[in-house]
UniProtKB/Swiss-Prot annotation:
GO biological processes: mRNA stabilization; negative regulation of apoptotic process; negative regulation of cell cycle; negative regulation of cell population proliferation; positive regulation of translation
Gene (UniProt): TENT5B
GO CC list: cytoplasm; nucleus
Organism, as annotated: Bos taurus (Bovine)
Function: Catalyzes the transfer of one adenosine molecule from an ATP to an mRNA poly(A) tail bearing a 3'-OH terminal group in an ATP hydrolysis-dependent manner. May be involved in maintaining the translation efficiency of at least some genes through preventing degradation of their mRNAs. Prefers RNA molecules that are adenosine-rich close to 3'-end. In addition, may inhibit cell proliferation and cell cycle progression through ubiquitination of beta-catenin/CTNNB1.
Major place of residence: cytoplasm
Molecular function as annotated in GO: poly(A) RNA polymerase activity
Signal sequence residues: none
Protein name: Terminal nucleotidyltransferase 5B
Lineage, highest ranks first: Eukaryota, Metazoa, Chordata, Craniata, Vertebrata
Region (Disordered): 1-46
Low complexity biased stretches: 15-44
EC numbers for this chain: 2.7.7.19
């Protein structure tokens, strides 16, 4: 049967739309240097936007194509997932079920790594942001159901799917579930487990009041053009023929933020809005060789961050859990030796800049940081003992000065296991 005229016209329009979109995704080669494309960075894009250069596009494509293992608990097999694959599967599934995806972005340290890999920060988690409308509880639930259902597609051949339920998949592969629903923030996060800490984090965002702490972690890279190119173009990418990819700095000025990343500068806007975790990020940057820019009021910045840390994490159990998770996520493997330096830096900042606590509360937190630092030092082996910052030469081995903490150093067992735990329900996020 021949198609009707209306059907033919409909197909032609659809083909024209795809062709137009694919053509729009293709651009002339950017300069081979490490900076943004000067043409794409014109004033028409706005100061907060910039086109990526060809080397940056290549790094982005390689990052999205690199298989990442999603480790299963118990007898569940390890899944091998390319980030671009899971983005495409999740996006198409959401839209098939009526939830429109307005765009997909790479966020955080992975985006910073694509723009400037020599910063020394590296990246752990792969943060993929889906812009969606989350106006109802059903929308939140749909994002979770779609991600869990998509995991079935990545199970190895030969694995029986008959008795595998979404609840089973959640227990097997999900590291963390977070749901935030307030007047200013509506988003959810699903983190997929990776034993090395390189979790794939799928974040579904309707609105977020603030998505960055400092200029160097404010970057987002729009992935739509690159994903469309890989689907539509039979020609491989080259310097002369590749998609035009746009980056954005939520800090405001893209060129300024990129300059901060290159020269290891700590800068921010509205420091009073930084969340509690910003204090840990700040100490992390200091340990990596970043320094506040000369115009920064360092004392005020540190006081803001300390105050917010104790607002968001008011008791010792929460503080310990937060510190251990952060250290495990950012200082594992070859970087484990930096844990001690980060904790010493955190101790100094909290000691100098905490003004919102009673003296005994402040002392409890400092003692907690000290205990974690001693534990980190012990894990480095006996040779590291000479680096103990709080030890006086005349103090006998194993004794910590009374001016800091009044107890002997003994083997410390972590209160919370470092193994990746599962979270069966949404976690509240302040």
């Amino acid at each position: 049967m021949m198609p009707s005229e209306s059907e033919t016209e409909s197909r032609d329009r659809a083909a024209a739309q795809v062709g137009t979109a694919a053509a729009a995704a293709v651009a002339k080669a950017a300069p081979a240097g490490g900076g943004p494309d000067p043409e794409a960075s014109s004033a028409s894009l706005g100061q907060h936007l910039s086109g990526l250069s060809w080397p940056q596009v290549k790094r982005l494509d390689a990052l999205l194509s690199e298989p990442i293992p999603i480790h299963g608990r118990g007898n569940f097999p390890t899944l091998s997932v390319q980030p671009r694959q899971i983005v495409q599967v999740v996006r198409s599934s959401l839209e098939e079920q009526g939830l429109r995806v307005h765009g997909v972005r790479l966020h955080g340290s992975a985006a910073s790594h694509v723009l400037h890999p020599e910063s020394g920060l590296g990246y752990k988690d792969l943060d993929l942001v889906f812009r969606v409308d989350l106006r109802s509880e059903a929308s939140f639930q749909l994002t979770k159901e779609v991600v869990l259902a998509c995991l079935l597609d990545f199970l190895p051949a030969g694995v029986s799917r008959a008795k595998i339920t979404p609840l089973t998949l959640k227990e097997a592969y999900v590291q963390k579930l977070v749901k935030v629903c307030t007047d200013t923030d509506r988003w959810s996060l699903i983190s997929l487990s990776n034993k090395s800490g390189k979790n794939v984090e799928l974040k579904f965002v309707d609105s977020v009041r603030r998505q960055f702490e400092f200029s160097v972690d404010s970057f987002q890279i729009l992935l739509d053009s690159l994903l469309l190119f890989s689907q539509c173009s039979p020609t491989p990418m080259s310097e002369a023929f590749h998609p035009s990819v746009t980056g954005e700095s939520l800090y405001g000025d893209f060129a300024e933020a990129l300059d901060h990343l290159r020269h290891r500068v700590i800068a921010t806007r509205s420091p009073e809005e930084i969340r509690g975790g910003g204090l840990l990020k700040y100490c992390h940057l200091l340990v990596r060789g970043f320094r506040p820019r000369p115009s920064t009021d360092v004392g005020a910045l540190q006081r803001y961050m300390c105050s917010r840390f104790f607002i968001d994490f008011p008791d010792l159990v929460e503080q310990r859990r937060t510190l251990e998770r952060y250290l495990e996520a950012h200082f594992s493997g070859a970087d484990a030796a930096r844990r001690y330096a980060c904790l010493v830096t955190l101790h100094r900042v909290v000691n100098e800049s905490t003004v919102c606590l009673m003296n005994h509360e402040r002392r409890q937190t400092l003692d907690l940081i000290t205990a974690l630092a001693l534990q980190a030092l012990a894990e480095q082996g006996p040779a590291a003992a000479a680096a103990l910052a709080w030890r006086c030469p005349a103090i006998p081995d194993g004794l910590v000065p009374a001016t800091t903490v009044s107890y002997y150093v003994t083997p410390v067992q972590p209160l919370l296991a470092r193994a990746h735990a599962s979270y069966p329900t949404w976690l509240p996020c302040n």
